[in-house]
């Protein structure tokens, strides 16, 4: 009887652990509109590039940006970003995309939520620390 009870309790705790782990993973997803993403992620990364000549964060962010584009514009966003990264001018990608897509994006997609890629979630804090140095 005690063995069954201990096994049942053990199984309960293991199940509880799985549930908590799944909940933690679900909470690690962050959604925001593209404008807020640019303010929170891209703008500080550009500042880090301008002040410290560190393009690492900006490049990593820009590589993910085409995935956030409307389906029919993904290829063009990627083409613009790849062209600027190829010549070492990541800071010029924003202006290029804004010139071409900003009006339409604001009109049709402004409130659309995008998922922030998990590998970028810690970037704002990391960039802030690097800017302090």
Task: List PLM regions with ranges.
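Positively charged n-region of N-terminal signal peptides that target proteins for export
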Residues: 1-5
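Bacterial N-terminal signal peptides
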Residues: 8-15
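Short Cys/His-rich local motifs and their 1-3 flanking residues in nucleic-acid-associated proteins
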Residues: 99
